[in-house]
């Protein structure tokens, strides 16, 4: 802690101006500690130098009770958070303070949340598929180990449930470490996630970091960096880490609030002019090195379902795979409501996933595309007016569409159906058999919410009795 002490001269909501001596202005991103009247320490981060002796800071917590003239101490370093084994099984805020009822974390090892991205020499990305056990993802938009994946969808189509299922599958099937970062989302969901993880036993392999929607914009803007910093430590120790960010849109949204509070002129649709720079600084740190990997899954809220909005559009540039959740699919009762035609992946390539996988995925997409084209004709004339070949395509497409649904472990209490983890070999075999026409006589409804193709046949036998 340095001896550089200033005084608060202005407070406008979460923006705090602090006056220091001319030659002792704190650096940009330094943490400033202000002792409140009730004894609590308010942490602010330096964002701008205003004039010769004033710094403009953003508070990481509420500023109620703060007044002018209070002393502010420059810590001489950015906000630092605990890293290492001590963070597993715990919940933290943006400052690395525990939010659960556990003991204080007195860890010697701390990392600053502002760190440079790994250099080109350190980076390593060998294209390799990451099995999730979710059929529609593994078959049509497979995830890359050490890649960045975007989960796109409007409000209420199932982004958070899909993330929870991924955490569950990764912990149980791969034994990997996960860092979950809740950025500007509902506290209730964080609470539910914590208790579900406690029940399923995956909490011991997970660190949770939250900056929820009731917190000041500074906390929501920086909490993604806190979670990333914890994940970077595990990566540098040679681990394969999963970093979940729910929701990356709130990172952009908080940045736009902070930008407006700092008086910057807004850019397109009211976003901050530095949107691409801020997103790039975060995303470039989420990468795999020669030591270990960070595979990141980022939920992306799409405002008004408009994919051309600057916030989701800026996120697109950084992704290796995108999983698009569709309201029209959710409306017909198929969950996960992943759009098989809009979702894509860079590694759906025969050199990475193999010839058989690539061929089956291509044929599935082709049939679904043809079915989409035929739907207009069906709506006007009915199925009976189609050619026999097209009737067969429609019948198989409907079976494929229903077979892309799957019961989730984390949704068991709502659906009453036991969750299923489906290995990629079983997924490919199931769809290959449907494409070959082996199950043309099986009723369509048997394919809905089944795991493997054997389960479909069991359901069909039960229905026939």
Swiss-Prot record:
**Which membrane topology describes this protein?**
Peripheral membrane protein
Return any one Pfam family short name: ATP-synt_ab
Q: Which GO MF term does the entry hold, naming one? A: ATP binding
Give the main localization category. Answer: membrane
Query: CDD domains annotated for this entry?
Result: ATP-synt_F1_beta_C (cd18110), ATP-synt_F1_beta_N (cd18115), F1-ATPase_beta_CD (cd01133)
Enzyme class, broadest EC rank? translocase
Q: Name one GO cellular component term.
A: proton-transporting ATP synthase complex
Query: Where in or outside the cell is it found?
Result: Cell membrane
Q: Does the keyword Membrane apply?
A: yes
Q: Which InterPro entries match?
A: AAA+_ATPase, ATP-synt_VA_C, ATP_synth_F1_bsu, ATPase_a/bsu_AS, ATPase_alpha/beta_chains, ATPase_F1/V1/A1_a/bsu_N, ATPase_F1/V1/A1_a/bsu_N_sf, ATPase_F1/V1/A1_a/bsu_nucl-bd
Q: Which Gene3D superfamilies does UniProt cross-reference here?
A: 2.40.10.170, Bovine Mitochondrial F1-atpase, Atp Synthase Beta Chain, Chain D, domain 3, P-loop containing nucleotide triphosphate hydrolases
**Reactions performed catalytically:** ATP + H2O + 4 H(+)(in) = ADP + phosphate + 5 H(+)(out)
So what EC number does this one have?
A: 7.1.2.2
Q: Which domain of life is it from?
A: Bacteria
Q: Which NCBIfam families match?
A: atpD (TIGR01039)
Assembly description:
F-type ATPases have 2 components, CF(1) - the catalytic core - and CF(0) - the membrane proton channel. CF(1) has five subunits: alpha(3), beta(3), gamma(1), delta(1), epsilon(1). CF(0) has three main subunits: a(1), b(2) and c(9-12). The alpha and beta chains form an alternating ring which encloses part of the gamma chain. CF(1) is attached to CF(0) by a central stalk formed by the gamma and epsilon chains, while a peripheral stalk is formed by the delta and b chains.
* Family note: Belongs to the ATPase alpha/beta chains family.
Function comment: Produces ATP from ADP in the presence of a proton gradient across the membrane. The catalytic sites are hosted primarily by the beta subunits.
Protein name per the record: ATP synthase subunit beta
Q: Which gene encodes it?
A: atpD
């Amino acid at each position: 802690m340095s001896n550089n002490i200033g005084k608060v001269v202005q407070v406008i909501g979460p923006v705090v101006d602090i006056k220091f001596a001319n030659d002792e202005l704190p650096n940009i991103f330094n943490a400033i500690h202000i002792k409140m009247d009730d004894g609590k320490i308010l942490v602010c981060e330096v964002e701008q130098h205003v004039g010769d002796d004033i710094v403009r800071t953003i508070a990481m917590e509420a500023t109620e009770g703060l007044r002018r003239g209070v002393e502010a101490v420059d810590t001489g370093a950015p906000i630092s958070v605990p890293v290492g084994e001590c963070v597993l099984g715990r919940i933290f805020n943006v400052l690395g303070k525990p939010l659960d009822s556990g003991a204080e974390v007195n860890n010697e090892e701390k990392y600053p949340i502002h760190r440079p991205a790994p250099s080109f020499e350190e980076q390593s990305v060998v294209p390799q598929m990451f099995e999730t056990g979710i059929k529609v993802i593994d078959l049509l938009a497979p995830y890359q180990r050490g890649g960045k994946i975007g989960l796109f969808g409007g409000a209420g189509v199932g982004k958070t449930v899909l993330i929870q299922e991924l955490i569950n599958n990764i912990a149980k099937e791969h034994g990997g470490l996960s860092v979950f970062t809740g950025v500007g989302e509902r506290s209730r969901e964080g609470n539910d996630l914590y208790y579900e993880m406690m029940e399923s036993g995956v909490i011991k392999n997970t660190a949770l970091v939250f900056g929820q929607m009731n917190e000041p914009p500074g906390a929501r803007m920086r909490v993604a960096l806190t979670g990333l910093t914890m994940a970077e430590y595990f990566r540098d120790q040679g681990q394969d880490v999963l970093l979940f960010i729910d929701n990356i849109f709130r990172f952009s949204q908080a940045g736009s609030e902070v930008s407006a509070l700092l008086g910057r002129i807004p850019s397109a649709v009211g976003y901050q002019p530095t949107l691409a720079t801020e997103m790039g600084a975060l995303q470039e740190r989420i990468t795999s090195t020669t030591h270990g990997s960070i595979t990141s899954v980022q939920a992306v809220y799409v405002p008004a379902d408009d994919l051309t909005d600057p916030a989701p559009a800026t996120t697109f540039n950084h992704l290796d795979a995108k999983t698009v959740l569709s309201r029209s699919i959710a409306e017909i009762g198929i969950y996960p409501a992943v759009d098989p035609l809009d979702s894509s992946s860079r590694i759906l390539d025969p050199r990475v996933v193999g010839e058989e996988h690539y061929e089956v995925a291509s044929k599935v997409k082709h049939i679904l595309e043809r079915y989409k084209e035929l739907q207009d004709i069906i709506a006007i004339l009915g199925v009976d007016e189609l050619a026999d070949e097209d009737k067969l395509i429609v019948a198989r497409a409907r079976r494929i569409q229903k077979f892309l649904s799957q019961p989730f472990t984390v949704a068991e209490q709502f659906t009453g159906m036991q969750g299923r983890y489906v290995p990629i070999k079983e997924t490919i075999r199931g769809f290959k058999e449907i494409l070959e026409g082996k199950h043309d006589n099986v009723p369509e409804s048997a394919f809905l919410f089944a795991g493997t193709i054997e389960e479909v046949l069991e359901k069909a036998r039960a229905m026939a009795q």
